[in-house]
Amino acid sequence: MAVKIRLTRMGSKKKPFYRINVADSRAPRDGRFIETVGTYNPLVEENQVTLKEERVLEWLSKGAQPSDTVRNILSKEGVMKKFHESKFSK
């Protein structure tokens, strides 16, 4: 089963916010997911992001692939750097 970390759209028309979910890659965008690991609100001035950092790192270490947008969000939050440091320090 290929697992992805990706965004699920929530909110109302013209006012979206997103949940960062871990889901099977074959599931629909807003369909079944395994776990919610954070949220992202692009409408706030500073693009508010909340993450369960330990869970994200655990899923990445298990082989979950982040989508391009989620990869950018994780990079800005410093999670990808921590993941690469832990991966190559072994």
UniProtKB/Swiss-Prot annotation:
HAMAP family in alphabetical order: Ribosomal_bS16
Matching PANTHER family: 30S RIBOSOMAL PROTEIN S16, SMALL RIBOSOMAL SUBUNIT PROTEIN BS16M
Domain of life: Bacteria
Transmembrane segments: none
Claim: Transferase is one of the keywords in the record: no
NCBIfam families, per the entry: S16
Keywords carried by this UniProt record: Ribonucleoprotein, Ribosomal protein
Organism: Streptococcus thermophilus (strain ATCC BAA-250 / LMG 18311)
Record protein name field: Small ribosomal subunit protein bS16
Example GO molecular function: structural constituent of ribosome
Cellular compartments per GO CC: cytoplasm; small ribosomal subunit
